[in-house]
Amino acid sequence: MIRYHLKELIAEKEFEERRRITIGEIAKETGINRMTLSKIINHPGHSTVTDNLDKLCYYFDCEIEQLVTHVKEANDESAPLAD
């Protein structure tokens, strides 16, 4: 499963800039729909297009590894099959 670190990146940016950052602001700056951002934040494993990931990396000035990580699950169907 893919895990997004969007909440953490928002918190870091809020701390650095000493102001509140809303989903609406991120949506406006990135062009990503508010509903999509909400799903990324609130629904673990939500699938989104790579263009959105690119826009978020640009907005937060971060590498992809800071935005997403892969979390192995015991019943992970996306894991490669053994020979």
Predicted features and spans:
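Short, charged recognition helix plus adjacent turn
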Residues: 68-83
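Helix-turn-helix/winged-helix DNA-binding modules
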Residues: 18, 45-48, 59
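A short, Lys/Arg-rich alpha-helix, primarily the initiator
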Residues: 1-25
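Alpha-helical DNA-recognition elements
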Residues: 39, 43, 55, 73
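DNA major-groove recognition helix of helix-turn-helix/homeodomain DNA-binding modules
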Residues: 51-66
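Recognition helix of helix-turn-helix/homeodomain-like DNA-binding domains
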Residues: 31-48
